[in-house]
Amino acid sequence: EMTQTLQGYMEQGTVKIGDKDDVADAGFVMLGNIDEAKMDEYQNMFEDLPSLFRTSALMDRIHGFIKGWDIPRMNEGLKISGWALNSEYFSSIMHLLRDDITYRAIVDRMVEYPANADTRDTEAIKRITTAYLKLLFPHVRSMQDIKPSEFNAYCLTPARKMRQIIVRQMGMIDLQYKGKNVPTFLIRDYE
């Protein structure tokens, strides 16, 4: 029952508890530790997780995977002193940007992909690309506000890589996905 609830939420943003349906518009991030020996996207990184997370049906609903081992471990040199951005202020801005559909519209206009591309792969890549656009280029209000090369390097390519890790992991537990790649996205010519 928990599996179906989680899959439903991840797919449609709805949760059914008893006879009551609730709609949510929040996403969520799952955090976890992977044994250091398995920190390799070309190995099955999910095998030690609970069985709920080792099904391709649930994994396919995960948009992307951030390789935490590429993020530097916190150390004294990373701490700041003096002026800083207040995290509550930053969180408020991110919350406001969540409702701004301009960024997704820009992504939809900028990218093209094969007509037969997998819907979940396409949606995951577009959502992650939109998130990168909001985070890294919050000033962008139209396609002309960002260079295609920057959009590709900092938004689209990282999003495709994050989704490809999920697809690769699914291929290790379900033959249906073995050797599958995410769709090729191209940036429309608009300059």
What are these model-predicted stretches?
Residues Q7-V15, D70, F137:
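Hydrophobic/aromatic-lined pockets within catalytic cores
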Residues G27, H63-N152:
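Conserved AAA+ ATPase small/helical "lid" subdomain
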Residues E1, M39-D48, N75-G82:
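Short, flexible/disordered intra-domain loops and linkers
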